[in-house]
């Protein structure tokens, strides 16, 4: 189940807001410019589906999203607990960073935490299968799928060079552990 927890950025122990209500999640996130939607997962994907098969299965949805956002490319990130780069990628994603474009993700399977840091607050959006999240350009954030990641997500990019992060150097993510 998807959840949203909002914290004062000086107090990781006591959420100011905790909800699993999709409408409230969307409203709270919209207030900081983040798009959040729950979609009925429109396509059944085999566990061993290739990235190309996943992109093709979701093509109508991708075309619509790419048209809305002006995106020029899409790819699939597929993480499993035995992925050879799981630890390395987790460490990279865990560091607070920004992008110069919106970060748009749709969870095909599995889950992960998108954590945004702005205006003295930390917004932990735990996204699950069927969730669409779009984090605006230049929003400080990090991502955590835990030490045993297991998810498939569509990633949509305006910049055709793909995922390009600009790390802030802020160590706040270490104070806000969100996944085991």
Curated annotation (Swiss-Prot):
Binds 1 Fe(2+) cation per monomer. The record marks 105 as: Important to generate the dianion. It catalyses: 1,2-dihydroxy-5-(methylsulfanyl)pent-1-en-3-one + O2 = 3-(methylsulfanyl)propanoate + CO + formate + 2 H(+); 1,2-dihydroxy-5-(methylsulfanyl)pent-1-en-3-one + O2 = 4-methylsulfanyl-2-oxobutanoate + formate + 2 H(+). GO terms for molecular function: acireductone dioxygenase (Ni2+-requiring) activity; acireductone dioxygenase [iron(II)-requiring] activity; iron ion binding; nickel cation binding. Keywords: Amino-acid biosynthesis, Dioxygenase, Iron, Metal-binding, Methionine biosynthesis, Nickel, Oxidoreductase. Fe(2+) binds at residues 97, 99, 103, 141. The keyword Oxidoreductase applies. The record marks 102 as: May play a role in transmitting local conformational changes. Pathway: Amino-acid biosynthesis; L-methionine biosynthesis via salvage pathway; L-methionine from S-methyl-5-thio-alpha-D-ribose 1-phosphate: step 5/6. Ni(2+) binds at residues 97, 99, 103, 141. Belongs to the acireductone dioxygenase (ARD) family. This is Acireductone dioxygenase. It comes from Acidiphilium cryptum (strain JF-5).
């Amino acid at each position: 189940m998807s959840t949203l927890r909002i914290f004062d950025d000086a107090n990781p122990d006591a959420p100011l807001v905790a909800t699993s209500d999709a409408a409230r999640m969307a409203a709270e996130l919209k207030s900081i410019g983040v798009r959040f939607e729950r979609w009925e997962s429109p396509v059944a994907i085999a566990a061993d589906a290739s990235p190309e098969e996943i992109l093709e299965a979701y093509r109508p949805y991708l075309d619509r999203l790419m048209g809305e956002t002006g995106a020029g490319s899409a790819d699939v990130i597929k993480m499993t607990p035995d992925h050879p780069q799981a630890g390395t990628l987790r460490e990279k994603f865990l560091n607070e960073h920004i992008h110069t474009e919106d970060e748009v993700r749709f969870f095909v399977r599995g889950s992960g935490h998108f954590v945004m840091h702005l205006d003295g607050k930390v917004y932990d959006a735990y996204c699950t299968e069927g969730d669409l999240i779009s984090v605006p350009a230049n929003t400080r954030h990090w991502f955590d799928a835990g030490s045993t990641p297991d998810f498939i997500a569509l990633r949509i990019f305006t910049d055709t060079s793909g995922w390009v992060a600009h790390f802030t150097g802020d160590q706040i993510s270490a104070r806000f552990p969100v996944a085991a």
